[in-house]
Amino acid sequence: MQVQNNKEEVPFAHYEEKFAALDPAEASKRCGVPFADGRFTVMLLGTNYEIRWPEYAISSDTESAFALKNLPCQTFLLRFLLEGRAAEPSAGYKTFREMPWGEMYIGPYTGRVLTRAAFTFGTRVEKFRAACEAMGALAIGHGDAGFQFDFLGGYRMQIMVYAGDDEFPPSSQVLYSDNFETGFAAEDRVVAGDILISAIKANL
């Protein structure tokens, strides 16, 4: 696995150390994920991962599974097991800005998620569509192409892209099931959007 820079490696090492001291029974109950034979089983974007405890290791029956080679994604999963909680029932979707602390983080979020999605996928709508379909996402009738993903447990995300033209640049929108606002901190919602885009991009 390649580590791109210290900004990825240092946070991962911090949470890996905290993970070793985790109470696995408490984490399993709080997050709603199974723990057996020294391993948590977590499903992210339709792929099952086994996370070994207390000496961290991640594995999957899918050799090309995205998180196996993406350190920020692994850090996100560690944070979920350390601080997250099982999804509450969801009644709908919200934009990032509509959720708590969304206004404060909207600048980084726009750059890391919306602008990146717009220029990564808005210029390649058909490839975006094919990648989402290959990932098992559900097509929705919004945007030039739009899909709904089961992100993690009962947390869902929708992503819509709009192709640019001579007058307007490409654009995008990402919606979160409203249980994200109680299940994740604002910075983790930014990372969730980043992970979704990176995972789709890996399938282009």
Task: State where each predicted segment sits.
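Short Lys/Arg-enriched alpha/beta "domain-start" segment
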Residues: 1-38, 73, 80-135
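Intrinsically disordered, low-complexity regulatory segments enriched in Ser/Thr/Pro
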Residues: 47-75, 162-187
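Short, charged/polar micro-motifs that form catalytic or ligand-binding hotspots
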Residues: 63, 67, 118, 145, ...
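Conserved binding-pocket/active-site segment within a compact domain
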Residues: 122-182
